[in-house]
Amino acid sequence: MATRGAVAAAASTIWKHRRNPSLRSLSRHFNPNFNHRIIPTGFKYQVRAIQGTSTDPVITPLKNREEPKPQNWKIKMLYDGDCPLCMREVNMLMERNEKHGTIKFVDISSNDYSPEDNQGLDYKTVMGQIHAIQSDGNVVKGVEAFRRLYEEVGLGWVYTITKFEPIGKLADVVYDVWAKYRLQVTGRPSIEAILEARKKDKVETCGESKNCKI
């Protein structure tokens, strides 16, 4: 604003100087200098990254944060924490659940996962497709599990259409295909190889303990 005012004043003076010869004598005294830049107070320059480094803040994945464990949860989500694609959806639900507090998240890939605490659902079974456990002990899976989970965080409308036929059956078929090939699509070993690796890891971690569960 100040720079534009100075330019306007200079232009007005020069114009009058041309029209009125009596002002020519002022030209030797009038020598405006516009080399100084005026920087508005409070203006901050944006710093660019140098040589490919990023200035974006490091965001801790929700998977690595302490998972909320609401006392009055309405549904428990059993998820595969080693699935990078799956974790995008899990992270979104975790964020939404911070407000609602109705979902309890259980990572089946954790060494602490216990089938006994989750209606007897073992690792291999839950790896086959998504499972969720309602507070009354009822187990839901597949598309229905997603629908119940989304409803608890205010996004029930996303899966509302799957309540109606034939859309519901079609959604189940599509999900079943995805669940069947999920490991290959995400570049992971077969379920047999994963189970064998978990078994070895359990042996190394637990030693001679009788309480470890595969």
Swiss-Prot record:
GO cellular component: chloroplast; mitochondrion
A UniProt-annotated Pfam family: DCC1-like
GO biological process per UniProt: tissue regeneration
Compartments it resides in: Plastid, Chloroplast
Transit peptide extent on chain: 1-49
Record keywords, A-Z: Chloroplast, Plastid, Transit peptide
Domain of life of the organism encoding this protein: Eukaryota
InterPro entries cross-referenced by the UniProt entry: DCC1-like, DCC1_Trx, Thioredoxin-like_sf
A GO molecular-function annotation: protein-disulfide reductase activity
Protein name: Uncharacterized protein At5g50100, chloroplastic
